[in-house]
Amino acid sequence: MKRMELIANKSVENEIIEGLEKNIPDFYYTLIPELHGRGKTKYKLGTATWPERNFMLISFLDDPEADKAETIIRKVKEQFPREGIKLFIMEVVLFCGNF
């Protein structure tokens, strides 16, 4: 199982979510609709001075679905090369028992 974290410019949010939902059956995720911060080139604070904003999408996927998600995100990056899109995929260790 993998944890996928995606941070991207709000301008590509619809393309990303539609691509993932269309191509990965039962794609479940958590969406954090607005993030503020600083990327490599500029601030994204949602203000008059720094108007751009990011969003974050988190999902837990089986390995084949994580591979599909990576392919989908690569296609969106190719379509929108100037928009900030960062994808992080990590291994997940599941723990069971009393907490």
Residue ranges and their predicted role:
Residues 1-99:
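Positively charged, small/polar-rich N-terminal and surface patches that mediate targeting and assembly
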